[in-house]
């Protein structure tokens, strides 16, 4: 991937006499000497290709030049004996295409010298805050520290600039998402072959997660949802402890992660291999909405417009079943959006200044119906690549037609 080109695009949006400082992050402490698996800051990864802790990217733009410096930890033989090898200077250069790589202990001095020369007026940080987060991330904490240390300099947010770039995937990124989806497909076939009454939800989850790792994924894109029966009506249920009963459905919302890029797929399977008449009626409504979104999505549209299209199809179907009397009552059974962007994050970033779809965007297509009184939760989710004239369903090969699902599960 062309990380140098991405940095060039960021430089174009930065003001002169400014600097961008991005931190990869640090380990998250759990308890005693236990740390959570490290996840690098996604924007740091996007601009460098590196996903290790304790790294810093410095991009400086003055009146005369643009300069990029990468700071990494120096190798410590004792630490490496316990925790594995660090990225070397040569490896960091090769991955990131950054020639100027220095060790981390020189970072503060480099910044102090840069600020003392009086050719920097403002500092950019990644101050993105997801709508559900109530705690600042590491980059936000560091931004506050720098604002206090250098009070005469403006602190600015670069997150929307990078978000706008991330919304349009290049060919390399699309290829990685395709691979993540392909691995997800193989794992779902394995799940369907083994799903049967009496299984625990966590066993279906285990079948999926075993197969994605076996086929080369680095792990799941997000915690696997495996909700059977009434649990399928809970949008983000991930306890996955109940038994899959005969005659019930199993809703699985899941995805593989491959080289940093995510798949996000939902399929709803009959536990015993055959949908009941009522389940089939609801399934057909959701599938019709899924197909209508895929048929309609194109450049210039917004996710809100796609959601309204899905709601109309779902509402019409629910009125035919007698579940609702008016179209605006559909919120009783469908209470989320039909789409979000997909990429490095499963709920990938969006730029507030530009919410219309452009070629290269990858979005989800995930209508659903959640009917508590029938203990039926059905969601069908695919991943769409927006093209010049419409869209391509990247997950088309993952079977969703109910006849095909029943035939596949019967032949096992």
Stretches with model-predicted labels:
Residues 1-412:
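Active-site neighborhoods and metal-handling regions in enzymes and metal-associated proteins
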């Amino acid at each position: 991937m062309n990380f140098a080109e991405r940095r060039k695009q960021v430089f174009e949006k930065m003001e002169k006499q400014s600097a961008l400082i991005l931190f990869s992050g640090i380990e998250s402490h759990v308890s005693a000497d236990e740390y959570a698996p490290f996840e690098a800051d996604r924007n740091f990864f996007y601009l460098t290709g590196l996903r290790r802790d304790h790294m810093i990217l410095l991009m400086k733009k003055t009146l005369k030049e643009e300069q990029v410096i990468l700071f990494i930890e120096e190798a410590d033989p004792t630490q490496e004996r316990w925790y594995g090898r660090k990225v070397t200077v040569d490896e960091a250069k090769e991955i990131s295409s950054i020639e100027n790589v220095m060790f981390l202990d020189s970072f503060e001095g480099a910044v102090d010298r840069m600020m003392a020369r009086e050719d920097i007026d403002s500092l950019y940080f990644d101050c993105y805050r997801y709508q559900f987060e109530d705690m600042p991330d590491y980059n936000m904490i560091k931004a506050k520290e720098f604002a206090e240390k250098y009070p005469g300099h403006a602190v600015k947010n670069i997150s929307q600039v990078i978000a706008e770039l991330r919304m349009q995937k290049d060919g390399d990124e699309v290829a990685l998402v395709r691979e993540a989806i392909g691995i997800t497909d193989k794992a779902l076939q394995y799940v369907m072959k083994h799903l049967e009454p009496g299984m625990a939800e966590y066993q279906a989850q285990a079948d999926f997660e075993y197969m994605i790792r076996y086929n080369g994924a680095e792990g799941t894109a997000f915690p696997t949802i495996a909700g059977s029966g009434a649990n399928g009506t809970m949008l983000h249920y991930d306890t996955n402890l109940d038994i899959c009963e005969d005659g019930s459905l199993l809703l699985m919302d899941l995805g593989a992660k491959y080289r940093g890029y995510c798949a996000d797929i939902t399929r709803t399977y009959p536990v015993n291999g055959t949908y009941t008449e009522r389940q089939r009626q609801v399934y057909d409504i959701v599938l019709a909405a899924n197909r209508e979104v895929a048929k309609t999505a194109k450049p210039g549209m917004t996710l809100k417009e796609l959601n309204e299209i899905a709601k109309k199809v779902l509402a019409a179907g629910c009125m035919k079943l007698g579940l609702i009397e008016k179209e605006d009552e559909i919120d009783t059974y469908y209470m989320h959006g039909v789409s979000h962007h997909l990429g490095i994050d499963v709920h990938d970033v969006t730029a507030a200044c530009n919410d219309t779809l452009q070629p290269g965007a990858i979005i989800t297509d995930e209508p659903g119906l959640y009917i508590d009184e029938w203990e039926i939760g059905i969601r069908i989710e695919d991943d769409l690549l927006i093209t010049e004239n419409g869209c391509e369903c990247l997950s088309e090969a993952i079977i969703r037609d109910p006849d095909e699902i029943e035939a596949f599960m019967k032949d096992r």
